[in-house]
From Swiss-Prot:
One of its GO terms (cellular component) is ribonuclease H2 complex. The gene is rnhB. This is Ribonuclease HII. It comes from Francisella philomiragia subsp. philomiragia (strain ATCC 25017 / CCUG 19701 / FSC 153 / O#319-036). Keywords: Cytoplasm, Endonuclease, Hydrolase, Manganese, Metal-binding, Nuclease. Manganese or magnesium. Binds 1 divalent metal ion per monomer in the absence of substrate. May bind a second metal ion after substrate binding. GO terms for biological process: DNA replication, removal of RNA primer; mismatch repair.
Length: 185
């Protein structure tokens, strides 16, 4: 059975997109070191990202913008991204395994697995792709808006990030539907 593993990154931050990734691994090849992306160092994630993208049978990465998150809400934006991931790889898998406890409303043979990023290698691989991709977006945001410190906090609601928003203002990459941002508008 060919498995498509899906995971997301970036539901909690105040800025940037939510990112979903899907990975189909070659069952003949194992990738050592796969784990939940949150349990890996940044260097290890980057190294595994290169290995996964080079050796996966197929993968895709989907972003949903802060503006779409504001229109839909974060749950619906995440489900939309996951749905797009599956549609992008349609016909290449038998079953979809998704990290978490919610599935998009779709017709795919699928299962939601709580802590799937620690249990299923395809989900672990998707977790790594989503996290590295989103972190790279945050590094680009840091280059564009260095005074906000995106390289450090990756958009999460840290004390520093909130202080910088107060000091420099809300950007178009901030999620305006999120309460901490609404309070600063």
């Amino acid at each position: 059975m060919i498995i498509l593993g899906i995971d997301e990154a970036g539901r909690g931050p105040l800025s940037g997109p939510v990112v979903a990734a899907g990975v189909i691994l070659d069952p003949e090849k194992t990738i050592d070191g796969l784990a939940d992306s949150k349990k890996l160092t940044e260097k290890k994630r980057q190294s595994l990202y290169e290995v996964i993208t080079a050796h996966a049978k197929a993968y895709t990465i989907v972003e949903v913008s802060p503006q779409q998150i504001d229109q839909l809400n974060i749950l619906q934006a995440t489900l939309k991204a996951m749905n797009q991931v599956a549609d992008n790889l349609k016909g290449q898998f038998d079953k979809v395994l998704v990290d978490g406890n919610k599935l998009p409303n779709w017709d795919y043979n699928s299962e939601a697995i709580v802590k799937g990023d620690s249990k299923v290698q395809e989900i672990s691989a998707a977790s790594i792709l989503a996290k590295v991709h989103r972190d790279n977006i945050c590094l680009e945001h840091d280059r564009l808006f260095p005074q906000y410190g995106f390289a450090k906090h990756k958009g999460y609601p840290t004390k520093e990030h909130l202080e910088n928003i107060r000091k420099y203002g809300v950007l178009n990459i901030h999620r305006k539907s999120y309460k901490p941002i609404q309070l600063l508008l």
